[in-house]
């Protein structure tokens, strides 16, 4: 494969070693032209969409290309943990199976099917409150035209005030650099008009929703407001909530 494909495989392998598994989607289609029950393998060279989610739990760079129902362009396969039980009624129903590195549905550059997911969760009691705008209908990704800012305003309603320890943002690209700033009691229409309490540089390696611990905890009193402002020097893709 290309250098980019090799790099992508290495990143996925690193995440499997770190987290134990990855979530992916691929196109599952029954049929002897795709399934090889003798080798518990699957390879579909023609479909770029997806219809089924599975977990990637390992890999074998030397898995023979001949061990697929149709010979793949090269050796190598991901070890997949499926959710359809252990009964051997087809390779994709045998608990685990091998998915070719070259399967079209996990290599499309035209859709989001190349995404792999991990969930790095924290303890539920790590924070007392989550300040958020909830209830929207879905998410979309916007890509800016050059440098940009993203911000939001929050009001402190807790009696006794609040201590802000972390903020969050959704990013739709790899290797993103930005400056994160927190402003206290900004004026309406200008979220950077308040008192600057904190500014820190942030690097986000992977796309997704990230919780960013602040370099210092910030205290607010009931009735205060604060603005969270991200500044990007270059074009950036952001996850944005939407109601329509």
Predicted region positions:
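Beta-sheet-rich sandwich/jelly-roll-like modules and their strand-loop junctions
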Residues: 105-192, 196, 218-223, 232-244
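Short strand-edge motifs at loop-to-beta-strand transitions and within beta-strands
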Residues: 208-210
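Conserved catalytic-core surface of thiol
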Residues: 60-62, 66-143
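Acidic Ser/Thr/Pro-rich low-complexity disordered segments
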Residues: 34, 87-96, 186-195
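Active-site-adjacent substructure of cysteine-protease-like catalytic cores
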Residues: 2-75, 79
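Acidic glycine-/aspartate-rich tracts in secreted/extracellular proteins
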Residues: 28-31, 59-64, 83-88, 174, ...
């Amino acid at each position: 494969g290309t250098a980019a494909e090799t790099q992508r495989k290495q990143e996925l392998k690193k995440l499997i070693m770190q987290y134990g598994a990855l979530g992916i989607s691929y196109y599952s289609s029954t049929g002897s032209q795709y399934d090889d029950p003798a080798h518990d393998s699957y390879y579909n060279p023609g479909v770029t969409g997806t219809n089924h989610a599975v977990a990637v739990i390992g890999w074998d760079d030397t898995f023979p290309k001949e061990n697929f129902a149709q010979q793949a362009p090269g050796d190598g396969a991901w070890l997949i943990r499926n959710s359809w039980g252990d009964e051997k009624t087809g390779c994709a129903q045998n608990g685990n199976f091998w998915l070719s590195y070259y399967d079209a549905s996990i290599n499309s550059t035209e859709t989001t099917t190349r995404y792999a997911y991990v969930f790095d969760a924290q303890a539920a009691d790590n924070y007392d409150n989550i300040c958020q705008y909830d209830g929207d209908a879905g998410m979309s990704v916007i890509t800016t035209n050059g440098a940009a800012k993203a911000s939001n305003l929050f009001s402190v309603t807790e009696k006794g005030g609040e201590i802000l320890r972390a903020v969050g943002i959704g990013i739709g690209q790899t290797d993103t650099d930005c400056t994160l700033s927190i402003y206290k009691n900004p004026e309406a229409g200008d979220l950077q008009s308040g008192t600057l309490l904190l500014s820190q540089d942030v690097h986000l390696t992977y796309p997704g929703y990230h919780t960013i611990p602040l370099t210092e905890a910030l205290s607010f009193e009931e009735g205060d407001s604060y603005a969270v402002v991200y500044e990007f020097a270059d074009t950036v893709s952001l996850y944005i909530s939407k109601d329509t």
